[in-house]
Amino acid sequence: MPQQLALMRGVPFVLQTAATATGNGIVVAIPPGFKNHTFHVTGSAGIASGVVTLEHASDPLYAGTWAQVAAPVTPLASTDLVTLATGVYNFVRARISTIVVGGTVTVTVTSD
């Protein structure tokens, strides 16, 4: 198994960087004591469409359908959208489920 990245309390972790294409992004492990999670979905100028789905699973290599942390997020141009989630998650990712058109999207998560 490849090396697994884990969050540090209160330190933002980038799950997607200036992304446009559909894909899972980076999977990060959440330490068991971290229950409050803040996801920032930041759209660049010019975004016309796209969807980011915030997901979690019990295994970083899980090949099935990951569970949604919250409702899918439609990034907006030059805007930082915040999604708050509470729960015990083993692994999270920010999957671009619909291609981003006209700009890029960056997604970060911070947990404690």
Segment roles from a protein language model:
Residues 15-32, 44-53, 72-82, 100-104:
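Surface-exposed ligand/attachment interfaces on beta-rich extracellular proteins
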Residues 47-63, 107-108:
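Short, surface-exposed beta-strand/strand-loop-strand elements in extracellular ectodomains
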Residues 2-5, 28, 32-35:
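Extracellular and organelle-lumenal recognition/adhesion modules and their flexible linkers in secreted
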Residues 1-15, 106-112:
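Short, intrinsically disordered N-terminal pre-domain segments
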Residues 11-16, 61-71:
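Surface-exposed loop/edge segments in extracytoplasmic proteins
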Residues 8-14, 25, 36-38:
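Intrinsic-disorder/low-complexity, polar/charged segments enriched in Ser/Thr/Lys/Arg/Asp/Glu/Gln
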Residues 34-41, 85-104:
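Noncatalytic modules at the cell exterior or secretory-pathway interfaces
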Residues 42, 55-57, 97, 110:
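A generic structural motif
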